C-alpha cells in the first residue's frame, strides 16, 4: 500500500479530522440547504426499471445501467441519474443477421437524464432529458449527437459509411 500511495503521489496527502455532529438543528439545516436540497430520494434499480418501461420506446432499445453524475443546471450543480439508450440485439427477433448487427443496427439513440432529488406527482423520476429524439427541459444540457456507438453492453464491432443505410431510431 505504501508504494501504491507513492506511485499515485498520495503519500503527501494531509489528513484532517472532520468532526461530525449527530445533532441536527434548524441553523444547521439553513446553513446547508444547498446540500440538503440535492439529497437523493430516488434509487438506481427503480429508475432503471422506469427508464426501460417508459423510455426504451422501441423494442430493440434498452437501458442496461444507471450512473450518477452532476451537471450545472440553472447555475447550480445538480445530481442526476443518467442512462444510455442502447441497441439490444436480443430484442431484434428474426431480424438478427450479420448485416443487421454490423451494418444496419449500429448504434443506440439518446439518453435519459433525471434528477435524483425530485419526483413527479405520481412518484416517478422527474425527467430532464427523455424521448426520441432527445428532448431536454433545460437549455443548459442539449443532446446534439444522440447516436451511441459504444456503451455498457455494446461491445461488438460495426462498420459505418457503407451502402447499407444505418437505422436511426
Tell where the protein language model's regions lie, with residue ranges.
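Soluble extracytoplasmic regions of secretory-pathway and membrane proteins
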Residues: 2-169
Amino acid at each position: 500500500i505504501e508504494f501504491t500511495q507513492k506511485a499515485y503521489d498520495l503519500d503527501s496527502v494531509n489528513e484532517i479530522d472532520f468532526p461530525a455532529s449527530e445533532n441536527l438543528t434548524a441553523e444547521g439545516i439553513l446553513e446547508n440547504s444547498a446540500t440538503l436540497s440535492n439529497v437523493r430520494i430516488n434509487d438506481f434499480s427503480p429508475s432503471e426499471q422506469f427508464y426501460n418501461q417508459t423510455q426504451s420506446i422501441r423494442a430493440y432499445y434498452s437501458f442496461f445501467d444507471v450512473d450518477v453524475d452532476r451537471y450545472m443546471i440553472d447555475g447550480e450543480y445538480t445530481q442526476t441519474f443518467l442512462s444510455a439508450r442502447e441497441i439490444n440485439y436480443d430484442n431484434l427477433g428474426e431480424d438478427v443477421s450479420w448485416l443487421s448487427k454490423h451494418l444496419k443496427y449500429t448504434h443506440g439513440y439518446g439518453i435519459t437524464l433525471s434528477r435524483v432529488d425530485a419526483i413527479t406527482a405520481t412518484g416517478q423520476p422527474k425527467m430532464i432529458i427523455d424521448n426520441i429524439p432527445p428532448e431536454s427541459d433545460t437549455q443548459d444540457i442539449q443532446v446534439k449527437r444522440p447516436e451511441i456507438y459504444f456503451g455498457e453492453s455494446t461491445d461488438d464491432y460495426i462498420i459505418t459509411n457503407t451502402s447499407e443505410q444505418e437505422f436511426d431510431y
